[in-house]
Amino acid sequence: FYLAFHQTMPAKAYMYPYPYEDYTELKVRKYGFHGTSHRYVSGVAQEMLGKKDSKIIVCHLGNGASISAVQNGKVVDTSMGMTPLAGVMMGTRTGDVDPASVIYVMRKRGLSLDEMNNRMNKKSGILGMIGTSSDFRDLDAAKKAGDEKAILAYDMFCYRIQLYIGAYVAAMNGVDAIAFTGGIGENSVGAKKQICEGLSFFGVELDEEKNAKR
């Protein structure tokens, strides 16, 4: 998971608003994951831009997914948190949810901590929404076949990524490039198109021909 690349995040980004002693005594804070991928891809994007002063958003999209804001080669913020459960919707993980909803589901279903942890990490996300697979290729096929749950899950996946991209444009006061990587980021022409179509306000333009190449 390689955490080191994310250690340049400022305290305002990595701190959680728990009682401060939870940070000092328990080290509860955002750490971030997929560091090797974010470091490499942001570096390549920076080289392609040909300038050191750059604002790059990296979208690592696979069964696990994370977004990072990288300014001048340093991470400003990232979507995963203390654990890989935080952030955008993933193959089997919830991503961000209302913390109180966790308590509610546990009480209503009589789940233990371990059972709820397993539910959120292994049984949610795309798998939880469509009930048959966590593979984005299966989701895409079901969407194209007109499955309503698949269409909703696909839209949710793209929407949550758009939200993070928008937030990170604000965090860096602009963006020079958005880089996609990971199995979905490299291969899903449709997902990249849908994500970028909602970002035209930021001046994002998708080259359809290049997007179709893998």
Positions of PLM-derived features:
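Adenine-nucleotide phosphate-binding core of ATP-dependent small-molecule kinases
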Residues: N118, G125-M129, F136-A171
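Phosphate/pyrophosphate-binding loops at sites that engage ATP/ADP/AMP, CoA/4′-phosphopantetheine
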Residues: A45-G50, I165-D176
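Conserved phosphate-binding/catalytic loops in two-lobed NTP-binding clefts
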Residues: V189, K193-R214
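Glycine-rich phosphate-binding loop of actin/hexokinase-like ATP-binding domains
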Residues: F5-M106
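Glycine-rich phosphate-binding loops at beta-strand->alpha-helix junctions
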Residues: G62, D176-G198
